[in-house]
Amino acid sequence: MQIIKTPLGIITRRGLQLSLLSLLLTMLSLTWAMPGWSLPLNQPMLLGALAQGNAITDPNAILRYALPIDNPEVRRLQDSLEDISNHIRAKRWPAIKKDVRAANLTITLKEDKILAGVPADRQPEAETLLGSIKTDLTALTEAVEAKDKEQVISFRKSALTAIGDLEALMVTDFPFAIPEEFANLPQLKGRATVEMTTNKGPLTIVVDGYSAPINAGNFVDLVQRKFYDGLPFIRSEDFFVTQAGDPPGPEAGFIDPQTKEYRAIPLEILVKGEEGPIYGMTLEDAGMYLPELALPFNAYGAIALARPETEPNGGSSQFFFFKFDTELTPPGFNLMDGRYSVFGYVVDGKETLEQLSEGDKIVSAKVISGADNLVNGNS
């Protein structure tokens, strides 16, 4: 599989600087290295509108919001602290103070309702996390009063990490049924963390089976099989993607040793508000344009399944890391959304990912948590 350069056709120029427009016009389309299988990413329908508001570019925030829970109070608490990221760079202290005040008010008045969202057997752990959040909020309040930017960033991160752990305790059941036609494929019924060691350094990847159980399950299964160990990065484009997972020999993906057949993985995209993922077609083909996705390409280090451009269900072992600089991307302007299955994010190791280029190697990959969430298919 390779990545080729193609023009993107017509783009909305609203609010774009010329330098950004030039960069977008040289974006790349993912295709397999087979003659005649290339289809440019040139449909203007994908590019004709910009989502309003601030796009979330923090992978940890995206993962928190993707948890399948229904507790408005904890979401309100999270929202207040997430919003600080929109103000901290410019040091808008009144807005930051308002966010912290709202967070303190929520945890003071709604603690019981937050705790009620956690199963009884997990509540002792939840109470500990709530205590940690309160401590962080006290320190955060003091840091805001002192206008100490670094301390604000530190205590906000600590509080949000605890909130994410608290929200994870609220998840009880897997949120949807996976279609029977994919029952033979590995499925990740939850989340897993993968530590990938490359010759340039380590990467920590959180893989989200709540939003993309088949794509995530396939990746975790191949990691468990040590399939990726020693494989090279076969293509890398600055400010766009770094791709790996192509096995040696003529095959373009994983051949199941039991069936001796190519393991084909479907396109799998979860739109927020839907009961389950859309399978087997791009969102454009499904008549959906720029919807809000559970796992968007907003974040640097999004990991997605590579596939033939004309075959939504033709992916297998090859994947790519999305490296486009989010600071150059208008809010919600994600050209890849709805065309490829995102199944996780790099949450640590951005510096490593920035250095990876064609010819570098995956030394090893291992699952360090969540392996028990992997359910092997029938083959």
Swiss-Prot record:
Keyword Glycoprotein: no
Residue intervals of the PPIase cyclophilin-type domain: 190-378
Short name of one Pfam family: CYP38_PsbQ-like
Signal sequence interval, chain numbering: 1-33
Cellular component terms per the entry's GO annotation: plasma membrane-derived thylakoid lumen
Taxonomy, superkingdom: Bacteria
Compartment(s) where it occurs, according to its Swiss-Prot or TrEMBL record: Cellular thylakoid lumen
Coiled-coil intervals, chain numbering: none
Catalytic activity, as annotated: [protein]-peptidylproline (omega=180) = [protein]-peptidylproline (omega=0)
EC number: 5.2.1.8
Molecular function, one GO term: peptidyl-prolyl cis-trans isomerase activity
Keywords, sorted A to Z: Isomerase, Rotamase, Signal, Thylakoid
Keyword Thylakoid: yes
Role: PPIases accelerate the folding of proteins. It catalyzes the cis-trans isomerization of proline imidic peptide bonds in oligopeptides. Required for the assembly and stabilization of PSII.
This protein's name: Putative thylakoid lumen peptidyl-prolyl cis-trans isomerase sll0408
